[in-house]
Each structure stands twice: as structure tokens, then as C-alpha cells.
Amino acid sequence: MLEDALVPDDKLIYVSPENLYYCYANDTIDQDDKWTSIQPQQGYIPILSANLRAYKIELLKKLRFSGQNNVSPSIKKEKKNLEPNKKITTKPTESTGSKKYLIPEQFIPDSLEKQLRTLTVILKDALYLGKNNRFIKENEVVSDDTRLLILDEFLKLIIPNYIDSLANWTLVDLNKGTDDESLLYLRFNESGTQSMISFYKKHSKMAKYMEIHYDTNTEKYINDNFKDDGDEDNVEAEQSHSVGEILKSMETAFEKARSQVGTFKGDINDDQDDKINYKIDYNTLLDIPSDSLEQLTKEILNFRTKVIDIEKQKQLRQQYEDNERRQKHMTQLFEKLRKGTKSNDSNRNMDIESTDTINDSDSEEDDDEEDEDDLAIEKRKEEKRKEEEARKYRALLKDYETTIEPHLHLLSQQYKQNLEYEKELAANREANVKDLLRQANDIYYDKDRSFKDREEQEDKLDREKYGDIIIEDIVIDDDRKGQKKLLEKDKKVKKAGEPAIKINLAFKKAMDNSIQDKRDKAEDIEPVSQPIEARSTNRYAALKEKRVVDELVKELLGVYEDDVVAYVFEILEKPEMSDEKKQSELVTEMEDLFDKEGAVQFAEQVFKALDEA
């Protein structure tokens, strides 16, 4: 099924409502591949694949809630043909003609042989079963099933060896105002070739009642198999006899159908025929005039069946509302359960109590809603829908007025200015010149635009004159100057008698050693940094101030734990361990609280924050 296919929700899928109705009529509604397609086809409309289920439910709901299914008569006929125990009208389907009838979609030939044995007959005048037929009274409409029975009798008269020679037939109406016609398509069996030729030979000139049409291949097929016996008089006699017999048979069929109740009641509702077969006792209507009997019969049938239809529609509507309420209640319950699993153990009891209270209130509200009238519920839903649509409309209108329209106006002005740029430049020439003069005389205006080129040129001249300066010499000279200053300071300290001689001597000795190392290695001197322990202490203090570890513990545990944070810093502040060993130990210790993956992620984030501190 296409609904279960792995189709993204934002992709298009093509559906055919007519094929869906066809599946509904033939009880194959679950076969979605018969009315959906992932490729565009003729008669299919595109929708989002995420809306496929809602679209199907909406169409089926319209089918069930309407008084009659919106299925074409041809589909209904096919459904009845698939069920041999059903009645076409009031007469059982014992005749062979009902079995030979096909809907136009199924009658289309699938081979050249079938096309050769197909004739098209245009029925007119008495043979046309529409409103202009001579046998149909005013304001009298023949039902579709009755037309099929009458045409079945008609074909038995005009086709020799009807049962064995005729394969299938179908009927298509052409509405052309007052000159209405019906197209009767006949397909003969391979053994019925002579019957087809005999039918063509007898009735090809009956232009008043019917016209026979065929394509060039069929004409060639008839001419190849046609044998002229030269007996034209007998042909005309048989033809005139056939016309009189046909007209008499048609009149008899109409009278017989008219005597059966419900045949001439207009557009018959097939769904009502399936639901109920209501019989009228005409003995109670003996006092009614004959001209009013037909209308009264219609009203009685409509009234009796309407009550049952309304009751069934109400039951379906009630069932639909109950399903919606149950679905809403289950959704709320699942939402509360999902939220309850995320809550802490300390708040779990309170959540359960509040959930019970909410469930009780929801059940009471549902009971109250069930007592309300269905019409009131529908009106309330309609009002909410209209309010939501009005709110969305106002939001869109406000966005258009405040954002889109001003932006479009600005773009329009800019476009007009660009079209008339030269005119604008000429018109504002005086103002532009004044602006340039003001900026030229402004003390803050940068008049020196080529300072970079000048500096590069001066640097090049300096290098040619003095050469490149080695960084080592500059560093050593600076160290010597610093050493000289320290010696002078030591002399002052000796004179003052302050007890800082050891510290200064040690510092002096360190400076001498550093200068000697720089001379030997010729490397850059880095500024004297703080001791490693002092730097580590500063890093841990900065990490504590940022409270990164606190946030990570709270995020992973769901609750802030002081003991866990203190234990983490206890591991980090061990002086005898390197950062790699600390990280490994932290992962090992945190596996008891978190899982393996969570412990690794926690340690990586802690040391990342420690490096940034």
C-alpha cells in the first residue's frame, strides 16, 4: 500500500477521487494502489503524502453521510452486476442481456479483432429512451435499469441468434438539446459474424429510427464476408415487419414497466433500494384520482425511507463524534504519561495526584459533552474554526501592512531612482559638489589615502640602509640592560640593609643562566610565566566561577548534586597526576553515575572548559 511506503511527508502524491469511489462501490477500498500514484497521470490531482490519510477519510465521510453516494451511475451498475442476487429494478436479472451489458470503460476493445466486430448504432425517435420518446409521458423519467431491460428486449428482436452471436453491448447518451440521441455499441462474437452482417443488411437504411456506423476496417470486414442473395423485396418486407414489431415491443415494454411501482419514479436512489424495499398497499389508495396517484406514491416512498436514512445518518454522526472524543482523551493521557516519565522522583507523587485530578475533570467534561446536542458541538467547532481563520487572516494582513507593503514601496522608489539616475545626478549636482567641498575641508576627513604605500617604501629604504635586525641581539641587549639595573638595585639594597639579598641573588643567578642559554641556543625568550601549580590553581578557580561542571551535572542527572561537583574538582586538583590520567580517572569514576558514553562526553566537556579557562 502506498500509505505504508517510505515516501517523505513533504513529497507529492497523486490521487483520483473517481477511482476511490469506484473502489468503494466494489468493496476494494483498502487497495490504495488503485486510486493513488507517485507519478502524474491524467485525472489525478496532487496532494502532500502526509495528507493522504486525512484526504481518504474526508472523502469516505462524505460518501457515508450523504443521502446518496456520489458515485456515477455506471459504477453503481457495475456494482449491481457484480452481485447476482441484487435486483436491477423490480424484475430479476434472469435475462441474458443484463449479463452482456458492460459499462463504457469496460467496453473499450483491447484488440483489433474485437474492434472489427464492433458496430455503433445511433438510436433516435421511438428507440431513444429519453424525454422525447413517444411512449414516455410528460414529467416521466425512465430509470437507468429500466432502460437496460427495454434495450435488452430491443436487441433480442433486431439481432438474429442474440444469445450466441452478441458478445457485449453498452449505452452512451448524447444530450444535444431537443435532438437527444443514444449511442448503442454492439460487439459480436467470432461465431456471430453472419448475425452482424444480417443486422447490418436489414437495418442499415432505417435512418428514421437508427443509424449504423463503423470504421473502415469493419466495413472491409463486412464486405469480405457479405454474400448478396439478390432478394431485395424479401429484405424490405423483413425490414418493415421488423420495424412494426420493434415499435409494438417497445410500447409493450413501457406499459409493463409503468405498471411496476418505482420504475418511473425519476432518478432512483440505489442506496435506498439496497436499504429498504417498502411496499405500498394500493387498496388503501382506491379513492385517490389516477392523475394524483403517482405523485402520492413518490411522497409516501420518500417519507418512509427518509426517516430511516435520517436515523442512520444520526447514528453514524454520533459514532464519529464518539471516536473523536475517545481519540482526544487517549492523546491527552499519552501526553501526561510522557511528561510523567521525565519528572523527578520527588515530584512523582504530586504528578500522579494532579494526573488523577485532571483525568477526573476530563471524564466529567467528556460526560457533559456527550450529553450536549450534536448540533451544538458542530456549531461550536465551526465557530472555533472561523475564529482561527480570522486570526490567521488578521496576522497575515498585519504582516503585509507592516513589512511587505513598506518594503515593496521602498523597492519601487529605488527602482524609479535607478531608472532616472542621470537625471537625479544632474539635478543634485550642486548639493553633491558642496558635500565634497565640506568633506575636503573637514579636519576629520582622511586626506592621506596612500599611507600604506609610503610606509612600505620607507621600510624598504631602512632595510637597504641598516640591514635586517636579528631578534637574538635585541633580546640579549635587553637582558643586559635588565641585569645592569638589577645590579644597581642590589647595591641600593645593601646600603639600606634590607633582608632581601638571597632572593635578589637567586633571581640574578637565574637571569645569568637564562642569558647564557639564549646565547647557546639562539632562541626567543618567552616572558617569565607563573609557576605550574599557581596556573593550575587559577584554572580551577576560573572553572569554578564559570560553573561549567555544575551545569553539566545538572543536565545529565536532571538534579543538581553538590557532592558530585566537589568530587569532580577533587580529581582535577590532584597535583601528582597529568591531565590525561585525570581525564581517564574521571571517566572511570563517572561510569557509575552515567553510562559509558555519557561519562566520556562529560569528561571531554570538563577538560575542554578547563583549557578555555
From Swiss-Prot:
Example GO biological process: mRNA processing
Where found? Cytoplasm; Nucleus
Which residue ranges are recorded for the region named Disordered? 333-384
Could you state one GO cellular component term attached to this entry? cytoplasm
Asked if the keyword Cytoplasm belongs to this entry, the reply reads yes
**InterPro entries linked:** PWI_dom
Q: Which residues form a coiled coil?
A: 293-332, 367-443
Bias type Acidic residues, positions: 359-375
Q: Which domain of life is it from?
A: Eukaryota
Question: Which Gene Ontology molecular-function terms are recorded?
Answer: RNA binding
Give the keywords, sorted: Coiled coil, Cytoplasm, mRNA processing, mRNA splicing, Nucleus, Ribonucleoprotein, RNA-binding, Spliceosome
Q: What does this protein do?
A: Component of the U1 snRNP particle, which recognizes and binds the 5'-splice site of pre-mRNA. Together with other non-snRNP factors, U1 snRNP forms the spliceosomal commitment complex, that targets pre-mRNA to the splicing pathway.
Spell out the family assignment given in the record's similarity comment.
Belongs to the SNU71 family.
**How does this chain assemble?**
Component of the U1 snRNP particle, a subcomplex of the spliceosome.
Protein name stated in the entry: U1 small nuclear ribonucleoprotein component SNU71
Gene that codes for this? SNU71
